[in-house]
């Protein structure tokens, strides 16, 4: 870090989003204690984990995982809320980096040559100003060195929020929602 950054942090210190403690050099968004306390699933270490099973019969997948457990009122919810509704894009990139760092140990990314974030409809992207999936993907791309492309998959129509829908209604809501764009060869 430069002396100017250190001086800036002296007068305008960054604090942990979860506990409020002042961040020290090298920490971003979360302090080490809160970062290490996030509830990891370890699903990437298990073949046929619950996330993979959820896709069976719906779409073909090689492997799938969920990085953190989500609980109402929990720390993961707070981070996602900060990313999605408070415009804190740095949260997404930090979470993407953290996830990629842990998944790389299990060879999860072997054979993957492109990171494609889930696209938002243009209307929603204009309203929000960014795509939170892109923030996560950017963090994954930085750690893995796998390039990210935001133009190969598009969202073909606008959909209402899925927040209050059940699992079946969510699947129905996104049926035929995405399309691949193949560049001219």
Indicate residue ranges for each PLM-predicted region.
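Glycine-rich phosphate/pyrophosphate-handling loop used in enzymes and phosphotransfer proteins
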Residues: 1-185
